[in-house]
Curated annotation (Swiss-Prot):
Lineage, opening ranks: Bacteria, Bacillati, Bacillota, Bacilli, Bacillales
EC number from the UniProt entry: 3.5.4.16
Full protein name: GTP cyclohydrolase 1
Gene Ontology terms, MF aspect: GTP binding; GTP cyclohydrolase I activity; zinc ion binding
Protein family per UniProt: Belongs to the GTP cyclohydrolase I family.
Ligand binding (Zn(2+)): C7
One Gene Ontology biological process: one-carbon metabolic process
Catalytic activity: GTP + H2O = 7,8-dihydroneopterin 3'-triphosphate + formate + H(+)
Keyword hit for NADP: no
Amino acid sequence: VEAEHMCMTMRGVKKPGAKTVTSAVRGTFANVAAARAEVLSFIKND
């Protein structure tokens, strides 16, 4: 999930367009770093 973080935009550092990325992994992707890295590389290459 990627979203604009309103706390960063409206107060604090006041950085418009600041993004927050949340991720969760389960099963093989939680336990095998190479498998997780491979899948994330495919996603990032959209």
